[in-house]
Design a protein with these regions (language model features):
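Short, acidic/small-residue loops that bind anionic groups at enzyme active sites
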Residues: 176-201, 290-307
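Hydrophobic alpha-helical
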Residues: 258-288, 303-304
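C-terminal functional extensions of proteins
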Residues: 298-324
Length: 324
């Protein structure tokens, strides 16, 4: 699963180009081309270090004592291995929490990996019925690319689109259309739920799945259709009918566990899939996977897993669900 670095005219071994970094410095561009560890596709890993830092030592009188010698550049002190930009709906409180839980539990193995979140403005976060869902889709899509462009201010190397696009779209091409605009606008590759869910289910050889979503009937119908279009059989599906993005984050784990036992355990399934980035699933997976002997693929752990594996970080992790 390790990624391959393709040495080319932008690589560390043969720097022939420069670029202007956000601090205004013109410096070498040591970008690399990567073959994704899961997708096998080639994408660019940009150089976000060679132009940094511009700094100088100043004494108590305000006099400049010396310039910091940048040399070939220095990496971000905390995200020196991989800097991930994460696009998160403004109502969401679970994405960063679950991803940081995984990173903190595996401090040594993920040292130098950082996530840097940018909110997608969703001023009309209600989606309790078909009309509200359509309005929510319009607002979300209108603000997604702007959020991605804002995320570039942190100079990320790779993006994660932390959203369940199947809430809106069952068609595979429509589902990929908005994340594709993000990649085109930023020039960065992105982990999406459609990519991560498919790769995760393939890892377990799953065909029949149980689907847990926070959606209303229209959203649940879209989600079922999406996974069927990916080639999976949805043996059982449960929507929680949450009225808004904020409501999703307040559904207690005990209730989700009840739904899993009542709706999925009696059914012959290969995996449980949890959609909705504000519907926390990591603690449930850690509690139930071994007991039920069924993998629980939650969107937030799966998105981080996909981003790490695509970028060649393949070590098994603890406290992160069976997926890792």
């Amino acid at each position: 699963l390790k990624s391959t670095i393709i040495m080319n005219e932008h690589s560390l071994d043969n720097v022939t180009k420069t670029k202007t970094y956000l601090n205004g410095v013109d410096a070498p561009d040591r970008s690399k081309s990567i073959v994704g560890g899961l997708s096998g596709t080639v994408f660019k890993l940009p150089d976000v270090n060679s132009g940094y830092p511009v700094a100088k030592l100043i004494d108590e009188s305000g006099a400049e004592v010396e310039d910091f010698q940048r040399g070939d550049g220095y990496p971000d002190t905390r995200s020196h291995r991989l800097k991930l930009g994460v696009l998160v709906p403004a109502t969401n409180c679970m994405v960063e929490s679950e991803m940081w839980d995984i990173i903190v539990r595996n401090r040594e193995l993920l040292s130098g990996v950082g996530i840097h979140a940018t909110n997608i403005l969703t001023p009309a976060p209600k989606f309790g019925n078909a009309e509200e869902l359509e309005n929510y889709k319009t607002v979300f899509n209108a603000n997604l690319v702007e959020a991605a462009e804002t995320a570039l201010l942190a100079e990320p190397q790779y993006l994660i689109v932390a959203f369940s696009m199947e809430h809106f779209y069952s068609d595979l091409d429509e589902n990929a259309s908005q994340p594709r605009l993000v990649e085109q606008s930023t020039g960065l590759s992105a982990a999406t739920w459609s990519k991560a869910a498919d790769a995760a289910l393939k890892k377990f050889g799953a065909r029949r799945i149980g689907l847990l979503c926070p959606f209303d009937p229209r959203g649940l119908e879209n989600a079922i259709g999406f996974f069927e279009n990916l080639g999976y059989e949805v043996a059982s599906a449960a929507g929680l009918g949450c009225a808004s993005g904020t409501d999703v984050g307040h559904v207690p784990d005990a209730y989700k566990e009840k739904v899993i036992h009542e709706r999925f355990v009696p059914v012959d399934i290969d995996a449980i899939v949890v959609c909705g980035t504000n519907l926390a699933s990591l603690a449930l997976a850690e509690k139930l996977e071994q007991k039920l002997d069924i993998p629980i693929i939650g969107i937030n752990p799966a998105l981080l897993w996909y981003a790490l594996r695509e970028n060649g970080i393949s070590a098994p992790l603890l406290g992160a669900s069976r997926l890792f």
